[in-house]
Regions:
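N-terminal pre-domain/capping segments
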Residues: 1-68, 72, 76-91
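Active-site acidic/histidine proton-transfer and metal-coordination neighborhood
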Residues: 74-176
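Conserved small/polar residues in nucleotide/adenosyl-binding loops
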Residues: 179-180
């Protein structure tokens, strides 16, 4: 069994490895950018490659999971907010894929009181579009699937029950692309 933690990655991601080692973690989760900002961190390709190589060289490997920024709301009825969300998700997924992450954890967002059924198709389509924006969706998902994290169920959150998560996966059309 592996034990891990979400650790601060800094601006180069590389400090996450030392932080994981310092606490004895053998799996790690990091944000690919500030969790409360739209602007993605611009990493040099050499940094992404160095992170991937360092985790591959780690004794036993150091599986990495990334967590998408909290601002993403794939259920937003506001076209501008939805556009920001889909762009941000694609950017987060691209970084996760580049560092060899095993998955990108995502809170799908909130329907803002409109109801889950109202946003279901939009959210499912946005998830598949993000995978396709970063390459062949099946190839990306095999290496780095989107992992929908359940929510506490407050307000209009999407994915607050097993039923909602199941329906979201089914609406996405290919259960190999997206996981919970």
């Amino acid at each position: 069994m592996r034990f891990g933690a979400h650790v601060r990655a800094g601006t180069t991601l590389l400090p996450a490895i030392a932080r994981a080692e310092a606490i004895g973690a053998d799996v790690v989760q990091v944000f690919t950018q500030s969790p409360r900002a739209w602007k993605p961190t611009q990493y040099y390709p050499e940094i992404l490659a160095a992170y991937r190589e360092a985790t591959d060289r780690h004794p036993g490997g150091l599986p990495t999971f990334c967590h998408a920024t909290y601002l993403i709301n794939l259920a937003s009825p506001d076209p501008e907010r939805f556009s920001l969300s889909t762009s941000c998700l694609a950017a987060n997924l691209a970084v996760a894929r580049a560092i060899g992450a095993k998955g990108l954890v995502l809170h799908a967002g909130s329907h803002l009181g409109a109801g889950f059924d109202t946003c279901l198709a939009q959210v499912a389509e946005a998830l598949v579009d993000a995978l396709e924006a970063t390459g062949d969706s099946a190839t990306v998902a095999a290496a780095c699937p989107i992992l929908i994290e359940n929510t506490a169920g407050a307000g209009g959150t999407v994915g607050r029950s097993l039923d909602e998560l199941t329906r979201l996966l089914e609406a996405a059309g290919d259960l190999s692309l997206i996981h919970i």
